[in-house]
From Swiss-Prot:
Its EC number is 5.3.1.1. It is found in: Cytoplasm. This is Triosephosphate isomerase. Homodimer. It comes from Dinoroseobacter shibae (strain DSM 16493 / NCIMB 14021 / DFL 12).
Length: 247
């Protein structure tokens, strides 16, 4: 059975004082419950990992450069994330695809780098509002899955997050039928490409304005194994409510 996962993406938010929120979230992370992951900005990764040592809380990065080191000013590599205490890294988030021009090939290279460093990659896919309105959602996501995920995927090194771009930070949420259609499609594509064993073991997260009040309804949808949470993960009261709905 796939273990549920609540992943919090803090994005470019949080100074050292925010470690108090992470400590409060730690109390909701239990070895026999849903897995709980926080992905803080790079400046907080090491202190948050140190604070979480000996607990069930997992720590992750928000991006990694494909190269392990080198003359890449301002970037962070997968080995650096691992060295700082990360066990996961988000790759291909829609904000990086849009703001930084990342393509599927870039996401694929980052995923390989993450695996080589011993990190589990959370590969993000999703359509824009224009693509959904044009009825191209599944075609877009199918292309992203094919282009972004390397051939050596396993249930241990890969998590896929579906994030409808038009729902991120807007308060808009797709219907449960829309979420279910996409998650079932992703599951089928993974099984088709990697076989039933791997395809059924990869966890699928929903990400797009997830809030405590609607979390239970989303988590009841077929093939939704958890959530990639943005703003609601910044406050322990909100994120622990989502974790409780998952557990």
């Amino acid at each position: 059975m796939r273990r549920k996962l609540a992943a919090g993406n803090w994005k470019m938010n949080g100074l050292r004082a925010a470690l108090a929120e992470a400590e409060a979230i730690t109390a909701a992370a239990a070895a026999d419950g849903p897995e709980v992951l926080l992905c803080p900005p790079a400046t907080l990764l090491a202190p948050m990992a140190a604070q979480a040592e000996g607990t069930a809380l997992q720590i992750g990065g928000q991006y990694c450069h494909p190269a392990p080191s080198g003359a890449h000013t301002g970037h962070v590599s997968a080995p650096m994330l691992r060295d700082a205490g990360a066990s996961y890294v988000i790759v291909g988030h829609s904000e990086r695809r849009q703001d930084d021009g990342e393509r599927d090939a870039d996401v694929r290279a980052q995923t390989l780098a993450a695996w080589q460093a011993g990190l589990t990659a959370i590969v993000c896919v999703g359509e824009t509002e224009a693509e959904r309105d044009a009825a191209n959602t599944l075609a877009i996501i199918g292309g992203q899955l094919a282009g972004s995920i390397p051939d050596t995927a396993t249930g241990a090194n890969l998590v896929v997050a579906y994030e409808p771009v038009w729902a991120i930070g807007t308060g808009r949420v797709p219907s449960v039928d829309q979420i279910g259609e996409v998650h079932d499609f992703i599951r089928a594509r993974l099984e088709q490409r990697f076989g039933e064993g791997v395809g059924r073991s990869v966890r699928l997260l929903y990400g797009g304005s997830v809030k405590p009040g609607i979390a239970a309804e989303i988590f009841a949808v077929s093939n939704v194994d958890g959530a990639l949470v943005g703003g609601a993960s910044l406050k322990a009261a909100d994120f622990t409510g989502i974790i409780a709905a998952l557990g």
